[in-house]
Amino acid sequence: MSAVAEAPLPIQMTDAAANKVKNLITEEENPELKLRVYITGGGCSGFQYGFTFDEKINEGDTVVEKSGVTMVIDPMSLQYLVGGSVDYTEGLEGSRFTVTNPNASTTCGCGSSFSI
């Protein structure tokens, strides 16, 4: 009997992030929604993380599923996010999705932008 090893996911989603996305999708009353994570130019460090809901999975997108929630990342953004993790935090500074990114060499003080 041979076992097939599962390839590690290129990016992780924490339980907190999956639970928040599930709650937001329920509020929107559209079970087709997926969390799209992307990178754009901007911010004080050069690149910014972006989060939006999308009903589509585009050709070439990487799909990560956790607890019934789907996260999609386009190929261009994925190259900057490999090995990272998407989380959801609540604190004195507010609540937000965050990315732990081992590829970032520097980040800004608020953590919303980074450079490589």
From Swiss-Prot:
Gene Ontology molecular-function annotations: 2 iron, 2 sulfur cluster binding; 4 iron, 4 sulfur cluster binding; iron ion binding
Keyword Iron included in the entry's annotation: yes
UniProt-annotated binding residues for iron-sulfur cluster: C44, C108, C110
Cross-referenced InterPro entries: FeS_biogenesis (IPR000361), FeS_cluster_insertion (IPR016092), FeS_cluster_insertion_CS (IPR017870), FeS_cluster_insertion_RrpA (IPR023063), HesB-like_dom_sf (IPR035903)
Summary of subunit composition and partner proteins: Homodimer.
Protein family per UniProt: Belongs to the HesB/IscA family.
UniProt-recorded name of the protein: Iron-sulfur cluster insertion protein ErpA
Organism: Aeromonas salmonicida (strain A449)
